[in-house]
């Protein structure tokens, strides 16, 4: 058995309780992680409040990212081994002593990072890297526009894009949030409640890539803000 933090009923933080659960067993292509640290993300708070349901077949325990040591490997796992330190993206279950996830969702702890630091990488850094750099192909010198710059994804995207030499533009919902985006390295931060981002980007020659986590009416406006041959992710 293992210790885990479970949600007794939807509500405030006091509905989180320590409980005993069976240690998960890895299936094919999966690993069991002995958790050292678990990240805290917005979906965890939403799940606690009864506003987020885990994916079908996932653990009902909160926790979407964690770091630790691989305790067991399922059949067919290659490139990972028992005792290896990793950080991992989870479908749920990170608030426990052990958690199971796909081996493909694990990343060796980067050089210079300890397990505490590594626990905060999967949820936002995996998302930004796969969407902005692998799918979007962001390159140094390109104009990069992202919406929701003060969110977890947004703050990560600003820093990564700036580190790789892109020009970063962002939108946020208040002047204070815009200032925070500028402090993180954005070249321009637009308060979308007061200013339209489309003419601003058109004046810059258009965005080479836009990361949109909003959708809806923003899709048409994003297309107007794109440069020729720009990419909307």
Where are these regions (language model features)?
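Phosphate-coordination loops involved in phosphoryl transfer and adenosine-cofactor binding
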Residues: 1, 83, 140-142, 207
């Amino acid at each position: 058995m293992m210790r885990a933090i479970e949600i007794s009923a939807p509500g405030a933080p006091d509905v989180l309780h320590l409980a005993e659960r069976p240690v998960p067993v890895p299936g094919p292509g999966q690993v069991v992680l002995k958790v050292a640290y678990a990240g805290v993300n917005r979906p965890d708070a939403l799940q606690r409040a009864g506003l987020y349901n885990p994916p079908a077949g996932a653990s009902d325990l909160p926790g979407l990212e964690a770091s630790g040591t691989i305790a067991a490997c399922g059949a067919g796992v290659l490139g990972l081994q028992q005792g290896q330190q990793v950080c991992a993206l989870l479908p749920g279950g990170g608030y426990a002593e052990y958690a199971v996830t796909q081996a493909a969702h694990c990343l060796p702890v980067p050089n210079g990072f300890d397990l505490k630091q590594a626990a905060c990488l999967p949820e936002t850094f995996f998302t930004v890297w796969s969407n902005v750099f692998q799918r979007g192909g962001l390159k140094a010198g390109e104009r990069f526009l992202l919406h929701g710059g003060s969110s977890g994804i947004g703050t990560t995207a600003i820093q990564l894009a700036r580190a790789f030499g892109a020009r970063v533009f962002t939108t946020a919902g208040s002047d204070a949030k815009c200032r925070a985006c500028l402090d993180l390295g954005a070249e321009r931060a637009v308060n979308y409640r007061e200013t339209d981002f489309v003419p601003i980007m058109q004046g810059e020659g258009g965005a080479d890539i836009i990361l949109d986590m909003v959708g809806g009416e923003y899709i048409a406006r994003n297309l107007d803000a794109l440069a020729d041959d720009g990419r909307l992710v």
